[in-house]
């Protein structure tokens, strides 16, 4: 992809497949891929739970936005953290980007994927109702900035891959 073009930015709740699908598409197409959470952990030498524990969620959201800005012109595909839309700065920044893809998923499937995952501080030890409340609080924001939405529990990785491939090809024509 030409870096004068906008990257594909994957948004959505935790456990919807942003990192898995982003990496898959990047590997298949020989594109650059950045997972913002992994980027933060490598850059700051702390895990996401450690950052939450030592500095709090707001501090993490500021790091997340800073790292998104750093990566926006260097990656072809970016997987954001599920809560990136919680930051007003990041949300407003994303509103001005193209190719925002919302990966959505059924909350029961999300819960089964992330239940008690120690690497997800906003999900750890939460009931399905608590997780659903958090999910519902974010839906409108995901919807507001998404160019396209895929239900990752209804489509296979390869089906999403081919849909994204069509977007990449269309993007390269402009």
Swiss-Prot record:
Binding residue positions for Mg(2+): 19
Pfam families, sorted: SKI (PF01202)
Primary location: cytoplasm
One Gene Ontology term, aspect cellular component: cytosol
Reaction equation(s) it catalyzes: shikimate + ATP = 3-phosphoshikimate + ADP + H(+)
Binding residues annotated for ATP, in chain numbering: 15-20, 120
Localization (cell): Cytoplasm
Tree of life domain: Bacteria
EC number of this enzyme: 2.7.1.71
Keyword tags: Amino-acid biosynthesis, Aromatic amino acid biosynthesis, ATP-binding, Cytoplasm, Kinase, Magnesium, Metal-binding, Nucleotide-binding, Transferase
Pathway: Metabolic intermediate biosynthesis; chorismate biosynthesis; chorismate from D-erythrose 4-phosphate and phosphoenolpyruvate: step 5/7
HAMAP family from the UniProt entry: Shikimate_kinase
Subunit and partners: Monomer.
Name this protein carries in UniProt: Shikimate kinase
Organism: Staphylococcus aureus (strain JH9)
